[in-house]
């Protein structure tokens, strides 16, 4: 159960990060915004890899991190055709790396599933913020998505605390 101190720390951290994020969104260039999104993607992939793979699996983790960098770069500098080509290449690359691990004793595709899901879930979906920012009124679209997400998460947190199961 969260104490008042941890709740205060959560709010203070959120406010500081919100100020930095708002400065980048409103005053930063598209490239700075994309760099911030890329940093968030890399941190997210690092966490994803540590949760889903655990120790070992260096090839899969490296593959996921490399793809996590290429996807937002392609979204920033390329177009939809480039992104589609990169995703097709990425799927093939994941399977090729998997082929090197196959032995006659075992055939476990879970590492392929984890890499592909991580690639689609974190870098591809988060790169949509860059796509939104590139639109004519991109700043407004980015802010709308962020406000909807933040309000939804905050309401869920406090509704869960209020109506949640008391142990």
Language-model features: locations:
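Membrane-embedded alpha-helical bundles of polytopic integral membrane proteins
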Residues: 2-167
